[in-house]
Amino acid sequence: MRKIVIAGNWKMFKTQAESQEFLKEFLPALEETPQEREVLLCVPFTDLAILSQSLHGSLVQLGAQNVHWAENGAYTGEISGPMLTEIGVRYVIVGHSERRQFFGETDETVNLRLQAAQKYGLTPILCVGETKQQRDSGETESLIVSQLDKDLINVDQTNLVIAYEPIWAIGTGDTCETTEANRVIGLIRSQLKNPDVPIQYGGSVKPNNIDEIMAQPEIDGVLVGGASLEAASFARIVNYQ
Protein backbone atom coordinates (compact mmCIF):
# COMPACT_ATOMS: atom_id res chain seq x y z
CA MET A 1 0.00 0.00 0.00
CA ARG A 2 1.53 3.28 -1.11
CA LYS A 3 1.53 6.21 1.29
CA ILE A 4 0.26 9.68 0.36
CA VAL A 5 2.89 12.34 1.14
CA ILE A 6 2.06 16.06 0.85
CA ALA A 7 5.13 18.23 1.45
CA GLY A 8 5.51 21.99 1.57
CA ASN A 9 8.95 23.31 0.63
CA TRP A 10 9.35 26.81 2.03
CA LYS A 11 12.75 27.27 0.37
CA MET A 12 14.37 30.48 1.72
CA PHE A 13 11.18 32.03 3.05
CA LYS A 14 9.71 32.72 6.51
CA THR A 15 11.37 33.90 9.69
CA GLN A 16 10.58 32.15 12.96
CA ALA A 17 7.90 34.72 13.74
CA GLU A 18 6.34 34.29 10.30
CA SER A 19 6.34 30.51 10.69
CA GLN A 20 4.37 30.80 13.93
CA GLU A 21 1.81 33.08 12.29
CA PHE A 22 1.42 30.51 9.50
CA LEU A 23 0.70 27.70 11.96
CA LYS A 24 -2.01 29.68 13.73
CA GLU A 25 -4.10 29.50 10.56
CA PHE A 26 -2.80 26.25 9.08
CA LEU A 27 -3.12 23.74 11.93
CA PRO A 28 -6.82 24.38 12.67
CA ALA A 29 -7.56 23.73 8.97
CA LEU A 30 -6.31 20.14 9.33
CA GLU A 31 -8.90 18.98 11.85
CA GLU A 32 -10.67 16.83 9.24
CA THR A 33 -7.60 15.83 7.21
CA PRO A 34 -7.46 12.03 6.78
CA GLN A 35 -4.92 10.59 9.21
CA GLU A 36 -3.33 8.41 6.53
CA ARG A 37 -2.06 11.48 4.65
CA GLU A 38 1.51 12.31 5.61
CA VAL A 39 1.80 16.10 5.76
CA LEU A 40 5.26 17.71 5.91
CA LEU A 41 6.72 21.17 6.18
CA CYS A 42 10.29 21.37 4.86
CA VAL A 43 11.52 24.67 6.27
CA PRO A 44 14.70 26.76 6.52
CA PHE A 45 17.21 25.57 9.12
CA THR A 46 16.49 28.57 11.36
CA ASP A 47 12.83 27.53 11.66
CA LEU A 48 13.41 23.87 12.51
CA ALA A 49 13.82 24.07 16.29
CA ILE A 50 10.82 26.28 16.96
CA LEU A 51 8.61 24.31 14.56
CA SER A 52 9.68 21.05 16.19
CA GLN A 53 8.05 22.36 19.36
CA SER A 54 5.04 23.93 17.66
CA LEU A 55 4.20 20.84 15.58
CA HIS A 56 4.56 18.36 18.45
CA GLY A 57 1.40 16.28 18.69
CA SER A 58 0.02 17.56 15.37
CA LEU A 59 -0.55 15.76 12.08
CA VAL A 60 2.38 17.62 10.50
CA GLN A 61 5.88 16.16 10.27
CA LEU A 62 9.01 18.29 10.12
CA GLY A 63 11.38 18.27 7.17
CA ALA A 64 14.69 19.92 6.28
CA GLN A 65 15.88 21.04 2.85
CA ASN A 66 19.39 19.58 2.81
CA VAL A 67 21.73 17.28 4.76
CA HIS A 68 25.48 16.69 4.53
CA TRP A 69 26.96 13.21 4.13
CA ALA A 70 29.40 13.53 7.04
CA GLU A 71 28.44 13.17 10.70
CA ASN A 72 30.49 16.28 11.52
CA GLY A 73 33.54 18.11 10.22
CA ALA A 74 34.93 21.25 8.62
CA TYR A 75 32.04 21.82 6.21
CA THR A 76 31.12 25.47 6.66
CA GLY A 77 27.46 26.17 5.97
CA GLU A 78 26.38 22.52 6.00
CA ILE A 79 24.26 20.55 8.49
CA SER A 80 24.47 16.89 9.49
CA GLY A 81 21.94 14.13 9.98
CA PRO A 82 22.45 13.88 13.77
CA MET A 83 21.89 17.65 14.09
CA LEU A 84 18.55 17.28 12.31
CA THR A 85 17.29 14.18 14.09
CA GLU A 86 18.19 15.66 17.48
CA ILE A 87 15.56 18.37 17.05
CA GLY A 88 12.84 16.11 15.68
CA VAL A 89 13.30 16.32 11.92
CA ARG A 90 11.85 13.29 10.14
CA TYR A 91 12.27 14.07 6.42
CA VAL A 92 14.83 15.85 4.28
CA ILE A 93 14.77 17.00 0.65
CA VAL A 94 17.80 15.80 -1.32
CA GLY A 95 18.84 16.79 -4.83
CA HIS A 96 16.30 19.55 -5.44
CA SER A 97 16.85 21.12 -8.85
CA GLU A 98 17.78 24.44 -7.23
CA ARG A 99 20.55 22.68 -5.28
CA ARG A 100 21.76 21.03 -8.49
CA GLN A 101 21.54 24.26 -10.51
CA PHE A 102 22.89 26.86 -8.08
CA PHE A 103 25.10 24.93 -5.66
CA GLY A 104 26.90 22.38 -7.78
CA GLU A 105 25.03 19.31 -6.55
CA THR A 106 25.82 16.23 -8.65
CA ASP A 107 24.33 12.76 -8.78
CA GLU A 108 27.35 11.58 -6.80
CA THR A 109 26.84 14.08 -3.95
CA VAL A 110 23.09 13.47 -4.03
CA ASN A 111 23.78 9.77 -3.53
CA LEU A 112 26.06 10.48 -0.57
CA ARG A 113 23.42 12.71 1.01
CA LEU A 114 20.71 10.08 0.49
CA GLN A 115 22.78 7.41 2.19
CA ALA A 116 23.65 9.73 5.08
CA ALA A 117 20.02 10.74 5.59
CA GLN A 118 18.99 7.12 5.95
CA LYS A 119 21.98 6.27 8.13
CA TYR A 120 20.91 8.88 10.67
CA GLY A 121 17.22 7.98 10.70
CA LEU A 122 15.80 10.46 8.20
CA THR A 123 13.52 9.71 5.26
CA PRO A 124 14.93 11.45 2.18
CA ILE A 125 12.80 12.96 -0.58
CA LEU A 126 14.86 12.51 -3.75
CA CYS A 127 14.10 15.05 -6.48
CA VAL A 128 14.57 14.16 -10.15
CA GLY A 129 13.47 15.91 -13.32
CA GLU A 130 14.39 17.45 -16.63
CA THR A 131 14.90 20.97 -17.99
CA LYS A 132 12.78 22.36 -20.83
CA GLN A 133 15.69 21.95 -23.23
CA GLN A 134 16.07 18.31 -22.25
CA ARG A 135 12.35 17.72 -22.63
CA ASP A 136 12.25 19.41 -26.05
CA SER A 137 15.20 17.24 -27.13
CA GLY A 138 13.36 14.06 -26.14
CA GLU A 139 15.77 13.31 -23.29
CA THR A 140 13.26 13.13 -20.42
CA GLU A 141 13.21 9.35 -20.09
CA SER A 142 16.94 8.75 -20.50
CA LEU A 143 17.85 11.57 -18.12
CA ILE A 144 15.54 10.39 -15.35
CA VAL A 145 16.65 6.78 -15.68
CA SER A 146 20.27 7.97 -15.45
CA GLN A 147 19.53 10.09 -12.37
CA LEU A 148 17.83 7.17 -10.63
CA ASP A 149 20.63 4.75 -11.50
CA LYS A 150 23.28 7.04 -10.00
CA ASP A 151 21.33 8.55 -7.13
CA LEU A 152 19.96 5.30 -5.68
CA ILE A 153 23.20 3.30 -5.37
CA ASN A 154 23.11 1.59 -1.93
CA VAL A 155 19.93 3.47 -0.97
CA ASP A 156 17.22 1.63 0.99
CA GLN A 157 14.04 1.90 -1.08
CA THR A 158 11.83 1.01 1.90
CA ASN A 159 12.68 4.38 3.50
CA LEU A 160 12.43 6.75 0.56
CA VAL A 161 10.17 9.25 -1.18
CA ILE A 162 10.80 10.40 -4.76
CA ALA A 163 9.58 13.70 -6.22
CA TYR A 164 9.32 14.17 -9.98
CA GLU A 165 9.89 17.87 -10.56
CA PRO A 166 10.02 18.91 -14.21
CA ILE A 167 12.37 21.85 -13.82
CA TRP A 168 10.60 23.87 -16.49
CA ALA A 169 7.42 23.81 -14.36
CA ILE A 170 8.94 24.98 -11.07
CA GLY A 171 7.79 28.47 -10.13
CA THR A 172 6.88 29.28 -13.72
CA GLY A 173 3.14 28.76 -13.56
CA ASP A 174 3.54 26.08 -16.24
CA THR A 175 2.20 22.81 -14.89
CA CYS A 176 3.08 19.55 -16.54
CA GLU A 177 -0.08 17.98 -17.98
CA THR A 178 -1.38 15.62 -15.33
CA THR A 179 -1.50 12.66 -17.70
CA GLU A 180 2.12 13.33 -18.71
CA ALA A 181 3.20 13.64 -15.08
CA ASN A 182 1.43 10.35 -14.42
CA ARG A 183 3.27 8.73 -17.33
CA VAL A 184 6.70 9.88 -16.18
CA ILE A 185 6.01 8.86 -12.60
CA GLY A 186 4.98 5.45 -13.91
CA LEU A 187 8.35 5.30 -15.68
CA ILE A 188 10.11 6.17 -12.42
CA ARG A 189 8.22 3.43 -10.60
CA SER A 190 9.19 0.89 -13.26
CA GLN A 191 12.87 1.57 -12.47
CA LEU A 192 12.52 0.88 -8.73
CA LYS A 193 13.10 -2.32 -6.82
CA ASN A 194 10.29 -1.37 -4.43
CA PRO A 195 7.06 -0.44 -6.29
CA ASP A 196 5.56 0.98 -3.08
CA VAL A 197 7.94 3.96 -2.89
CA PRO A 198 5.71 7.07 -2.70
CA ILE A 199 6.31 9.25 -5.76
CA GLN A 200 5.26 12.89 -5.68
CA TYR A 201 4.74 15.46 -8.40
CA GLY A 202 6.28 18.91 -7.96
CA GLY A 203 5.96 21.94 -10.22
CA SER A 204 3.46 24.81 -9.92
CA VAL A 205 1.09 22.79 -7.72
CA LYS A 206 -1.81 25.03 -6.70
CA PRO A 207 -5.23 24.74 -5.04
CA ASN A 208 -6.89 24.88 -8.47
CA ASN A 209 -5.03 21.87 -9.90
CA ILE A 210 -4.43 19.62 -6.89
CA ASP A 211 -7.61 17.55 -7.30
CA GLU A 212 -6.76 16.71 -10.92
CA ILE A 213 -3.15 15.89 -10.01
CA MET A 214 -4.12 13.58 -7.16
CA ALA A 215 -6.71 11.79 -9.33
CA GLN A 216 -3.85 10.27 -11.35
CA PRO A 217 -3.22 6.65 -10.34
CA GLU A 218 0.59 6.80 -10.23
CA ILE A 219 0.86 10.04 -8.22
CA ASP A 220 1.22 9.58 -4.45
CA GLY A 221 1.45 13.19 -3.34
CA VAL A 222 2.96 16.55 -4.17
CA LEU A 223 6.01 18.65 -3.34
CA VAL A 224 4.66 22.19 -3.12
CA GLY A 225 6.72 25.38 -3.33
CA GLY A 226 5.08 28.81 -3.49
CA ALA A 227 1.57 27.58 -2.71
CA SER A 228 2.79 26.18 0.62
CA LEU A 229 3.70 29.65 1.89
CA GLU A 230 0.08 30.68 2.44
CA ALA A 231 -1.80 28.74 5.09
CA ALA A 232 -5.18 28.66 3.33
CA SER A 233 -3.59 27.68 0.03
CA PHE A 234 -1.56 24.82 1.47
CA ALA A 235 -4.46 23.62 3.61
CA ARG A 236 -6.61 23.33 0.48
CA ILE A 237 -3.87 21.27 -1.16
CA VAL A 238 -3.51 19.00 1.88
CA ASN A 239 -7.30 18.57 1.98
CA TYR A 240 -7.65 17.73 -1.72
CA GLN A 241 -10.78 15.88 -2.78
Swiss-Prot record:
Keywords: Cytoplasm, Gluconeogenesis, Glycolysis, Isomerase
InterPro entries attached to this UniProt entry: Aldolase_TIM (IPR013785), TIM_sf (IPR035990), TrioseP_Isoase_bac/euk (IPR022896), Triosephosphate_isomerase (IPR000652), Triosephosphate_isomerase_AS (IPR020861)
Pathway as given in its UniProt record: Carbohydrate biosynthesis; gluconeogenesis; Carbohydrate degradation; glycolysis; D-glyceraldehyde 3-phosphate from glycerone phosphate: step 1/1
UniProt subcellular location: Cytoplasm
Example of a GO cellular component annotation carried by this entry: cytosol
GO molecular function list: triose-phosphate isomerase activity
Main EC class the enzyme belongs to: isomerase
GO BP terms, alphabetized: gluconeogenesis; glyceraldehyde-3-phosphate biosynthetic process; glycerol catabolic process; glycolytic process
E.C. number(s) listed in UniProt: 5.3.1.1
Protein residues bound to substrate: 9-11, 171, 204, 225-226
Job of this protein: Involved in the gluconeogenesis. Catalyzes stereospecifically the conversion of dihydroxyacetone phosphate (DHAP) to D-glyceraldehyde-3-phosphate (G3P).
NCBIfam families assigned to the protein according to its UniProt record, in alphabetical order: tim (TIGR00419)
UniProt protein name: Triosephosphate isomerase
Species this protein is from: Trichormus variabilis (strain ATCC 29413 / PCC 7937) (Anabaena variabilis)
Organismal lineage: Bacteria, Bacillati, Cyanobacteriota, Cyanophyceae, Nostocales
